[in-house]
Amino acid sequence: MNKLRQKYLQKWLRAQQEPIKKLMRANIVLATLSSFILVAQTYFLATLLDKLIMQNVPRDELIPYFLGLIIGFGMRAIILWAREKIGFQSGQLLRNHIRQKILDKIHLVGPATINQKPAGSWASIMLEQVENLHNFYARFLPQQSLSAIVPVVIFIAVFPLNWAAGLILMITAPLVPLFMIIVGIAAADNSQKNMDTLSRLSAQFLDRLRGLETLRLFNRTSEQTEHIENATEDFRETTMDVLKLAFLSSAVLEFFTSISIALMAVYFGFSYLGQIEFGTYNAPLTLFTGFFCLILAPEFYQPLRDLGTYYHDRAAGIGAADAIVDFLESDYLTVHQNEKTISLESAVEISAENLVVLSTQGSALTKPLNFQIPANHNVALVGQSGAGKTSLMNVILGFLPYEGSLKINGQELRESNLADWRKHIAWVGQNPLLLQGTIKENLLLGDVQANDEEINQALMRSQAKEFTDKLGLHHEIKDGGLGISVGQAQRLAIARALLRKGDLLLLDEPTASLDAQSENLVLQALNEASQHQTTLMITHRIEDLKQCDQIFVMQRGEIVQQGKFTELQHEGFFAELLAQRQQDIQ
C-alpha cells in the first residue's frame, strides 16, 4: 500500500467520525482535566515530601496535602472510567455506522454483485475488518489529541520552576514520535496484508465447510485440509510480522523515554551536588523543584508512549479500511431508484425493446432482447448454462442495470420504485433460503397475515403437506436448512411463494431437487397458480413445458426462438436441446 493510499484511507477514517464528535470532544476535555489534576497531585506530593524531609513540619500540618492527594487519585480514577466508557461507546457507534453503510451499499448493488465474492470474504469485511476499526476511534484518535495537550500542560507547569528541566523535555519530546513513525512506517502495509490473508482464510474455510460432504464424496478432504493449513500458516506469518513491529516499536519508545528521564535525573543530581548551577533563575534549587519535575517527567512522555502503542491501532485501522473503502467507493452501476409506483390494478404484463442487461461494472451480459409477456401467461425460459437466463431474471427483479426499454404494465422499470415493485413478486430460486426457526415462521415470510387455512392450502399445492403433517408446523429448522431434506426445503419455498400471492411469479429451477412424482405434482400446482398471475420460469427440464403459454429459447445472450412447445419442438436450437435432454434421460 503506497503512502498516498494510506493518507487517503486515514482521511476517510477521520471523515467518518461525524456521529461521535461530541463524544470525542468529551473524551479530550476529560483527559485534559485529568492532566491538570495530575499536576495538582504532583504539587501536593512534592510539597509534602519537601516539608516532611527538609522543613521538619509537624505531621498534623501535612494532612491537607494527604487529603488533596487522595481526592486527586479518586477524581482521576473516575475520569479514567468515564473516558474508557466514552471510548467504547465511540468505537461501537462508529462500527455500527460503518456496518450500516456497508449494508446500504449491499442493498443498493443487489445479490447479483454480492455473489461475485465468497460469503467468507463478506463475513470478514462485516465482522473482523469493521471490528479492527474500533481502536482507531476509541483509542488512537483521542490519544493523538492528548499527546499534544498533556505535554504542553506539564511543560507550562515545569518551565517556570526550572528552565533547564523544561528545555530537556522540549528537546527530547520530538524523539519519541519521530522514532515511532520510523518504526511504524511498514505497520500499515503489514496490517493490510494481515487483513487480506484473514479474508482469504475466512472465505476458504467457510466454502470448504459448506462443501464438506462433496469433498468427502470425491475423496478430497486431505488435499483441502492441506490448503486450509497453508492459508492458516500464511495468516500466522502475517500476524507475527505485525507483532514483531509492535514489540520493536514498544522497545524503541521505552528506550528513548528512559534516556530522556535519565537526563533529567542526572541534571538534578549534579545540581544538588553543586556541579551544575544553571536553570533555576538564580534561585536556590529546592527538593520540591526536583521532586516536582522528576515526578512529572514520566507523565510528560506517557501520552507519547501511549500514542506509540496506539499507533498500531492506526495501522490496523488503515489496513482494515482498505477493503471497506474499496467496496463502498466502487463505481457499481445500479438501477436508479424512483418514487413512482407501478400500476398493478391489472395483471402484470412485461415488454422489452432492445433490452441489454448490464453487469454492475457496465459490461453487457446479453445482446439486445425483444419480447412480450402478456398478463397471466406462463412463460418458460430455457437455454444452456451461461445463456443469460439468470441475468434476465435479475434485471426484472431490479438487481441489474440495463440499456434499452423494460416496461412493466407500460411503465419503465428504471423510473419505478423498485422496493414497491418487489413486494408484488413471488420468487423461488435453485437453492432457497430457509431461516433458522420453525416451518411456520419460514412460511409466514411470504405473508405475515396468512391464516392456518391459507397455509394448509399452500402446503397442499406445493406437495409439502405430506411431510409437514408428520413434522408439525412448529418443527425447528436449523441454520442452513438443517433438519429437513433439500427436496423438502424446495417444496417449502414453493409453498412460501404461493402464499405470497404475488402478481408476478419468478421461478429459477423450482423442481431441481424433487423426485419425478413430486415434480409433476408441483408443476401442476404452479400451472394452476399461473392462471391467476404472470409466471416466468427458468428450467432445464424442457420436456415438461407443454403446458406453458410461451417458451423463450436463449443462446449466447440472445433470444433465438419464441413460441409454444408444439411450434418449437421440431426445429432450431430448442429441438437440439430437447433431443439432448431426452438422450440424457435415457
From Swiss-Prot:
The family database entries (Gene3D superfamilies) matched by this protein are listed as:
ABC transporter type 1, transmembrane domain (1.20.1560.10), P-loop containing nucleotide triphosphate hydrolases (3.40.50.300)
UniProt catalytic activity: L-cysteine(in) + ATP + H2O = L-cysteine(out) + ADP + phosphate + H(+); glutathione(in) + ATP + H2O = glutathione(out) + ADP + phosphate + H(+)
The membrane-topology field of this record reads: Multi-pass membrane protein
Q: Where does this chain mainly localize?
A: membrane
Kindly give the CDD domains that the UniProt entry links to this protein.
Answer: ABC_6TM_AarD_CydD
Source domain of life is Bacteria
The Swiss-Prot or TrEMBL record annotates one GO molecular function as: ATP binding
Complex and partners: Forms a heterodimer with CydC.
Its biological purpose: Part of the ABC transporter complex CydDC that exports the reduced low-molecular-weight thiols cysteine and glutathione to the periplasm. Export of these thiol-containing redox-active molecules may be crucial for redox homeostasis in the periplasm, permitting correct assembly of various respiratory complexes and formation of correct disulfide bonds in periplasmic and secreted proteins. CydD contains transmembrane domains (TMD), which form a pore in the inner membrane, and an ATP-binding domain (NBD), which is responsible for energy generation.
State the family it belongs to.
Belongs to the ABC transporter superfamily. Cysteine exporter (TC 3.A.1.129.1) family.
Q: What is this protein called?
A: Glutathione/L-cysteine transport system ATP-binding/permease protein CydD
Give the source species. Answer: Haemophilus influenzae (strain ATCC 51907 / DSM 11121 / KW20 / Rd)
User: What gene is this protein a product of?
Assistant: cydD
